[in-house]
Amino acid sequence: MSKATETNGTRPKLPVGKILTRTIKMLWEFYPVLLPVALLATVVQAIMQSLPSVFLERILSIISNYIDSGDWSSAEGLVFQNVALLATFYVLGLLANIVSTQGMAIVTQGALQKWRSKMFSHMQDLPIRYFDTHLNGDIMSYYTNDIDAMRQMIGMSLPQLLFTSVVIISVIFIMFYYSALMALVILFGASLMALATKNLGGKSAKNFVKTQKTTADVEGHIQEIMNGEKVVKVFSHEPETIESFDKINDELMVVSRNANLYANTLMPILNNMGNIMYVIVAIVSGVFIALNVQNISISGLPFTIAVAVPFLNMTRQFSTQINLISGQINSVVMGVAGANRVFEMLDEPTETDEGYVTLVCSETIDGQVQEAEYRTGYWAW
């Protein structure tokens, strides 16, 4: 048992970048058409999600002009056109969401099925020494814990990160289009949120990786003890068995507690930072309007309420996307850890087949084993 555990603990770990690259490359090989279609639909959905701020500014500008001129008849048509166009974009976003979610569901489950088949086929060709140095429970965890972690990463985390990245890039472009000064204010607050995510999320991620490995060790230990339970009872080895299990079980408790401690602390902190950033943006916008601060923007529009209100909406969007990223980091880390173990198993060298073995009758003459032409009850090959 100790030998197997020690062997598992010293296996080399692949770099995270190579693991993700290899995972995506294999997904592309499995689904060369459906995967890019699903990813493209995710990008379209993200762009549609970023557009409401643009239409909000347009509608507020139209209403503001109506208040000044009193000509509602001309403003009514423009408002209806913008609302209808926004509704069209929402419908496109809904259709893109359907294509994205359904496509990624097919890709995820199909890819996992192919990985399980590849692992099982590869396992049949592994040498006996591999099974002598790896616990049965540890091998089983490839098909359960590790595959499930990959499912979470491929089916939810990676599409969510792509969606969030596109939304953030789109919102940043829109912010600088309307006001560079306000964009810098929001980016400063976002950088503080990113710093908190890096510090707390990094500590949480390390413990989630340890949790993934320790869970496999616990399963391997339990599987080994269950298979040898009769031997344990015959030799009255129950106290030592309980002691060894308590040790590894306590280790799993510690790493799981630390992982969830940091993860559960991060989200409330980010939510409150997002609320503070929202208030700061509202105050700064009011000051800019009151002092008639000259706006610096690509659009050339003055800084008015029509510009300020969409920035409040974009502040919410920005903080929400950062929260979503922080929530997916742990799933990605656990998925990478699971993929690393799966790829290590697939990369194990197979047993060399040097032909068939023929059994013959043998006898020992002068200390040398020789082939006998009659039945001796002893065999050699």
Give the positions of each predicted feature.
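Membrane-integrated ABC transporters
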Residues: M1-Q49, S64-L85, S100-M104, T108, ...
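Juxtamembrane helix-loop junctions of ABC transporter transmembrane domains
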Residues: G9-V16, M48-S64, D68, F89-N136, ...
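An intracellular "coupling" helix at the cytosolic face of ABC transporter transmembrane type-1 domains
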Residues: K25-P32, I128-R129, I147-I154, L158, ...
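Transmembrane helices of ABC transporter permease
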Residues: F30, L34-V44, P159-K210, I283-F303
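Internal alpha-helical transmembrane segments of multi-pass membrane proteins, especially GPCRs
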Residues: P36-L40, P52, F80, A84, ...
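Helix-loop-helix
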Residues: N65-I67, I174-F188, Y262-N340, L346, ...
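Hydrophobic alpha-helical transmembrane segments of ABC transporter permease domains
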Residues: A96, S100, T108, T144-G189, ...
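Solvent-exposed, non-transmembrane helices and loops of integral membrane proteins
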Residues: L135, G220-I222, T350-T364
